[in-house]
Curated annotation (Swiss-Prot):
Gene behind the chain: khpA
Source species, domain of life: Bacteria
Organism: Oceanobacillus iheyensis (strain DSM 14371 / CIP 107618 / JCM 11309 / KCTC 3954 / HTE831)
Gene Ontology biological-process entries: cell wall organization; peptidoglycan biosynthetic process; regulation of cell shape
Protein name according to UniProt: RNA-binding protein KhpA
Pfam families (alphabetical): KH_KhpA-B
Keywords in alphabetical order: Cell shape, Cell wall biogenesis/degradation, Chaperone, Cytoplasm, RNA-binding
């Protein structure tokens, strides 16, 4: 899942080397914390959050962690 998120986000940002993805796993959910360069935050979120919503939709649709709910937190 980290590779999927990184490949999507890397094509959007100017500083792909500064992409950091941390995974926090709990009983019923998995949270991926995405951190990018401050200049790239707007590109990842997009106008009215459209790009962030599209990334989240792809991540949610490709979940591989069984019955756990997946969340993507963009910082």
């Amino acid at each position: 899942m980290k590779a999927l998120i990184e490949s999507i986000v890397a094509s959007l940002v100017d500083y792909p080397e500064e992409i950091v993805i941390n995974k926090t796993e709990e009983e019923s959910k998995v949270v991926y914390h995405l951190t990018v360069h401050p200049d790239d935050v707007g590109k990842v979120i997009g106008k009215n959050g459209r790009i962030a919503k599209a990334i989240r939709t792809v991540v949610y649709a490709s979940k591989t962690d069984g019955n756990k709910r997946i969340y993507l937190d963009i910082m």
